[in-house]
Amino acid sequence: ATVCYNAASLIERTINSVEEQDYPHVEHLIIDGNSQDATLEAVHHYQERNSVARVPHEVNCLSEPDHGIYDAMNKALRMATGHYILFLNAGDTLHSRQTLSLVACAATAAYGDHALPEADDSDLGMLPAVVYGQTDIVDEQGHFLRHRRLTAPEVLTWRAFRHGMTVCHQAFFARTDLARRMVYNTAYRFSADYDWCIR
């Protein structure tokens, strides 16, 4: 899911990153806070390109006023239908065009194949609650600058967050059925993602 507001200068990078993914089962939710710039125009062009793509992704856009980023992220949680949800907001990008395929492979390792199960609660329980990775810092052109200061631990527990947000939400793939039970606390202006990841 991509949350944005007046993000015309940033949204193309994110759209292109998702559009390039080689994983065929992508649901891209774009939750826009009623942008007044060219953000929605870029999203509509994306939807048009996607409609004629060889392997189209499902692209849905909701544009309406919200009460901040975490309210918008909660809207995405309610709309999501996939097995996992990732918040890749305007300006964020995935590491490579294989990122989502690699995540699906990691999530389904217990199955011995690379196909996610049908959306059946009994099958979903076999999938890991979270799949996560490292985060790189890049410049405006997308060139690598450095690895993020806090590195993701080998095993993720709530204790790993004692020293800060060890896994960025941009690298935190949460199982949708579980994530939906723990909405973002909109009372927090800046740290609701930290609180959400711990829960």
Name each model feature, range by range:
Residues 1-199:
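Nucleotide-sugar donor-binding/catalytic module of glycosyltransferases
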